[in-house]
């Protein structure tokens, strides 16, 4: 941790002090808006600050320590959106809707140094719209999903992409193909390591249908998702292991200045982003992934260095700063 010597000879740890300052602010934020948090009321709080304190604030909200400071990036005039809620008797729950969004400035993606990966969630399907658990059922994009993929293609049209990867399933593959329409000659490699979590007997079901047969398991999925193995399906640790192994293989194959497109699914993207942020499988609800949303991961110190989550879940190309994509099941 950074240590400085002050004029009087005493030692000063600026990052440690920032984390303490951010922690006090979070406590005050919770106390000031307790009624809205517990009552489910909608309140929007604008916080304007400097690069370092905003990163410290996000770490505190996510329950992370200062070791994650360099995992985040905050550009000038960027917007990050975090959603807070609290059930009676439970701690405050935090969801990162987006991080370091500067699309409104009209400058495209932030500049990069070193390898870059563009992690995209597939466009919408009919089952997303209906709220059905689709898992490994191979549902294609609907018309809205194709429009989302084309919007992502337009947004990324000026980005130089050298490699592209997707899940073997139709919805991410179709999304990747539409994005690559602006990047002729870039081959698409599909890999089973990026397929969606297997929901087993939940696949094709609406939440209320699952609640009739597996009410306790569904409640656990919402409260403690890392403890659940789907009936005849997968658990998050299995998805975590295969998605991270695939991610590391993709990263390891990049040259120093290459950019790769990776198109996958909600749970897969969440496990990857949680790992990069220093979170665990228990924390996947902390990260939002909208259909057609773009996240950016950089390796500014090279492939052997630590990754930086430069942007998370950018959806401005789909119509606004806030994520208005379907809130359907995985």
Describe the role of every protein-language-model region.
Residues 35-48, 160-168, 187-191, 259-263:
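Short glycine-rich phosphate-binding loop at a beta-alpha junction
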